Curated annotation (Swiss-Prot):
Function: Acts as a component of the essential kinetochore-associated Ndc80 complex, which is required for chromosome segregation and spindle checkpoint activity during meiosis and mitosis. Required for kinetochore integrity and the organization of stable microtubule binding sites in the outer plate of the kinetochore. Participates in SAC signaling that responds specifically to disruptions in spindle microtubule dynamics. The NDC80 complex synergistically enhances the affinity of the SKA1 complex for microtubules and may allow the NDC80 complex to track depolymerizing microtubules.
GO biological process, one term: meiotic spindle organization
Gene: Spc25
Family the entry assigns: Belongs to the SPC25 family.
Protein name: Kinetochore protein Spc25
Coiled coil stretches, renumbered: 42-106
Keyword check for Cell division: yes
Record key words, sorted: Cell cycle, Cell division, Centromere, Chromosome, Coiled coil, Kinetochore, Meiosis, Mitosis, Nucleus
Chief location bin: nucleus
GO CC, any one term: nucleus
Organism (species): Drosophila virilis
Protein localization: Nucleus; Chromosome, Centromere, Kinetochore
Length: 210
């Protein structure tokens, strides 16, 4: 009977150990499942973060390219602006020079008008010098029409309207101013400019009789 009791006791101990092992296995299985679940979630998060990081890198590269293009455009605009400012400064200088030349031409035109009572048709300029002058001797109207660069034409007009003229000194002054610093037009000789340039101005009123 003692042997039966011992056998039963051993069986109970074995059953208890088996149940304990089974519980431990279940606990380990639960922990393993939980670990694998967390691991899978972590891997998914890592993949998602890697994908987002890739997108951010792509966007960053795009933004970097845009910044480089904007900087290049800004530099180009700045260079163009500097070029335009330089061009404007040169144009201002040219305009100032042209204004001085125009003022000198206007002064010459006043001398011409006073010296010879000359009217110039502005519609014929700048190709031709066309108009009418009044002879100081008899008040005769003398029409003229010649090429704007024809020095001989102006010389002939000078001779015709200044016979016995009391304003000969003004004509000489006009010629002197004309020969000093008149600008030469492109493609024309300087010799054909000095005398003709001074009368290429429209006089807005007809000549007066003296």
């Amino acid at each position: 009977m003692s042997n039966q009791f011992n056998t039963r006791k051993r069986l109970m101990a074995m059953l208890a150990n088996e149940m304990r092992l089974e519980q431990e296995e279940n606990a380990i299985a639960k922990q393993s499942a939980k670990f694998h679940s967390k691991f899978a979630t972590t891997m998914e998060n890592i993949k998602r973060q890697q994908h987002e990081s890739k997108k951010l890198n792509t966007l960053l590269n795009q933004r970097r390219d845009e910044v480089e293009k904007r900087n290049a455009l800004k530099n180009a605009v700045r260079d163009k602006l500097a070029e335009e400012e330089q061009h404007c400064a040169e144009m201002q200088a040219q305009l100032g020079k042209k204004k001085q030349e125009r003022d000198k031409l206007i002064a010459c035109a006043h001398i011409l008008s006073e010296a010879a009572n000359t009217y110039i048709n502005r519609k014929a300029l700048p190709e031709r010098v066309k108009g009418v002058a009044v002879s100081p001797d008899n008040g005769q109207w003398i029409p003229f029409d010649f090429n704007a660069h024809d020095r001989q034409g102006l010389a002939a007009l000078w001779t015709q309207v200044n016979r016995s003229s009391r304003n000969i000194n003004k004509w000489r002054q006009l010629s002197s101013v004309g020969n000093s610093s008149m600008p030469a037009p492109s493609g024309k000789e300087n010799a054909n400019v000095s005398m003709t340039s001074v009368i290429e101005i429209d006089l807005t009123s007809p000549p007066s009789q003296k």
